[in-house]
């Protein structure tokens, strides 16, 4: 009888205010670290992490009030509860796993809504892109338009569904093109009429898998294939720094957060 594969994780994080924003409204849960002081630039790496582990990034909605507070509220709650989630996932059947993730999303949503209510703001919101690693599997859970990629053998696939609305515009110079609209769901939304459609994906881990979580401050400027090339060519922290530099060189109009996890 074969035993469990003993994977370890190496993780690297970079978060930057970008060139245009007045504050860094992105946040994250990375080990014990969240951006509690909303620093303009954060870099951190964690090596040789034993399973289970969980990581997340949050992109506060700049179009709504208190976007930075919303992402921080979600990051703090995620950081405080993710170990309990990992414990519950152990030996849970498929139905129970879905219930665990659904409970987490609604709890995060309620925390953001409560914060907004206390601040007397009608609406505040944030995205979520998260990874939960058990001994042999990864679970992707996301809300909003922050992306999760899997790079395997040089190929890159986005492995989460984006809750982003798109609009087709007809430009007389550029022709028809698709542009981003708002979000169809996010943490902080009113669920009294419409609830969440859960975006969950389960993946069997393999050695040398590379996961990348990022806010749209990266993907607005850097193509998927470029992300794959850089993470395959460069090591943990060098790759996220290079990707950040690319986004900044091409405008850096939004906050940029990149979280890379290597399966070893």
Show where each model-derived region lies:
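PP2C/PPM-type serine/threonine phosphatase catalytic domain
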Residues: 1-264
């Amino acid at each position: 009888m074969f035993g469990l594969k003993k994977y370890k994780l190496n993780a690297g994080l970079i978060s930057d205010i970008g060139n245009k924003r007045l504050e860094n409204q992105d946040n994250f849960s990375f080990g014990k670290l969240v951006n509690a002081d909303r620093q303009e630039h954060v870099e951190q790496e964690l090596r040789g992490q034993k399973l289970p582990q969980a990581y997340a990034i949050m992109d506060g909605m700049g179009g709504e009030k208190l976007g930075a507070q919303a992402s921080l509220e979600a990051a703090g709650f995620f950081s405080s509860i993710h170990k309990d989630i990992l414990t519950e996932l152990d030996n849970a059947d498929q139905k129970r796993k879905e219930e665990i993730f659904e409970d987490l999303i609604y709890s995060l949503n309620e925390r953001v809504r409560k914060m907004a209510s206390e601040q007397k703001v009608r609406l505040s919101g944030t995205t979520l892109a998260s990874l939960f690693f058990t001994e042999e599997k990864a679970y992707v859970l996301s809300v909003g338009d922050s992306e999760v990629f899997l790079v395997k053998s040089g190929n890159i696939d986005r492995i989460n569904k984006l809750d982003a609305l798109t609009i087709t515009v007809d430009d007389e110079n550029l022709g028809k093109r698709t542009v981003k609209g708002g979000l169809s769901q996010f943490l902080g939304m009113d669920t009294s009429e419409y609830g969440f459609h859960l975006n969950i994906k389960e993946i069997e881990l393999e050695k040398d898998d590379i996961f990348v979580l990022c806010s749209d401050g990266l993907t607005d400027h850097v193509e998927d294939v470029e992300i794959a090339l850089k993470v395959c060519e460069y090591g943990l922290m060098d790759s996220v720094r290079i990707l950040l530099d690319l986004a900044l060189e091409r405008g850096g109009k939004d906050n940029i957060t990149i979280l890379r996890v290597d399966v070893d």
